[in-house]
Structure formats: structure tokens, C-alpha cells
């Protein structure tokens, strides 16, 4: 199940206290959140996506959000748990396809050291 960051203060906490990693298409903020625990003691992640109006019109911004969330969904089982993630799209992401966005995301995840193991799922490979 994909849990989202929804409230402004959740995003602000990740921006202020989290660590950032960047490449040419995306910026990733990561914050280890101790509150991300179920009643059974299982940890989980939350994800938020921010796409500025500079990226394009609403159709383009929505497509970018869908690409980011789908790539995250495919790789979420391989990530360490108990974190809040915020992906910020840069203007250069406009016009990029699914694989290019996935490659950029995997690069940031690797930089941040968030893989549970070395296996990352790639679609269409």
C-alpha cells in the first residue's frame, strides 16, 4: 500500500529536518520518521511528490507525478522502512519517459543508501 504525505507540516518537517539528494531530473528529501510504525510494530514509508508550475501545464505536471509514483511503487519493496520521502521534479523532467525517470530515481535512492538489498525492480528489462 502506498501511503502519502498530505499535510503541509509533514512536507515542511521533511524539508527542514531531512537530508537532500539531487540529480538533473529530481531532488529527493529523506527523513527517518519514528512515527511511521503500525500498532503491530511494523515500520512503513510515506511519499510525497512536488511538481512546480515551471515544469508545465497541469496535464504535464500530473503525468510527471504519475511517473514518479509508479516508479516508487515498483521499487518500494526494496527500500528500507520508516522514512518519509519527498520527490521534487525539476524542469528538465518535462518530456522524459518512464525509464529515464526510473533511472533518475534509482540513482537518488542509491546515493541516499536506502536500498534494503541490491536488487531493484526495473520494468521492461
UniProtKB/Swiss-Prot annotation:
EC category name: hydrolase
Single GO BP term: tRNA 5'-leader removal
Superkingdom of the source species: Bacteria
Recorded GO CC terms: ribonuclease P complex
InterPro entries, per database record: Ribosomal_Su5_D2-typ_SF (IPR020568), Ribsml_uS5_D2-typ_fold_subgr (IPR014721), RNase_P (IPR000100)
SUPFAM superfamilies: Ribosomal protein S5 domain 2-like
Reactions this protein catalyses: Endonucleolytic cleavage of RNA, removing 5'-extranucleotides from tRNA precursor
Key words of the record: Endonuclease, Hydrolase, Nuclease, RNA-binding, tRNA processing
PANTHER family: RIBONUCLEASE P PROTEIN COMPONENT
Subunit structure comment from the entry: Consists of a catalytic RNA component (M1 or rnpB) and a protein subunit.
HAMAP family xref list: RNase_P (MF_00227)
Role noted for this protein: RNaseP catalyzes the removal of the 5'-leader sequence from pre-tRNA to produce the mature 5'-terminus. It can also cleave other RNA substrates such as 4.5S RNA. The protein component plays an auxiliary but essential role in vivo by binding to the 5'-leader sequence and broadening the substrate specificity of the ribozyme.
Descriptive protein name: Ribonuclease P protein component
Gene this chain is encoded by: rnpA
